[in-house]
């Protein structure tokens, strides 16, 4: 399951579909999270704000690690939340833990 803040939708995800999403020429912020994770719950409104601010300049999505174990393994997600920015299929930035909206906006803008 993937939650897309820009499209305001939830859809099933697999490795092929994920690779299509991150191949975008616009930056894609990916939040690897878990439903049982307190800090992940704190990030949800932050990500909503970031998605509104960046608009269609970037995409903000969430990936549930418990429902997408293959993606979690491939991208070596060891703690949640783990946030990554991809552009043209390449990992451009990565961090773990609660991250302020200003930091996420700044990192996304580097890749517009």
Q: What label would you give each PLM region?
A:
Residues 1-29, 34-59, 67-74, 78-82, ...:
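Proteins that catalyze or organize thiol-disulfide redox chemistry
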Residues 62:
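Conserved residues in the N-terminal Rossmann fold of short-chain dehydrogenase/reductase
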């Amino acid at each position: 399951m993937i939650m897309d803040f820009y499209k305001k939708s939830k859809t099933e995800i697999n490795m092929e579909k994920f690779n299509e999403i991150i191949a975008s020429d616009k930056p894609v912020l990916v939040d690897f999270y878990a439903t049982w994770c307190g800090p992940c719950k704190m990030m949800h409104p932050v990500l909503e704000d970031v998605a509104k601010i960046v608009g269609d300049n970037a995409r903000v999505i969430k990936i549930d690690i418990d429902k997408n174990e293959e993606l979690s393994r491939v991208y070596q997600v060891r703690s949640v939340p783990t946030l990554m920015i991809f552009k043209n299929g390449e990992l451009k930035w990565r961090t773990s833990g609660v991250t302020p909206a200003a930091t996420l906006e700044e990192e996304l803008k580097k890749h517009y």
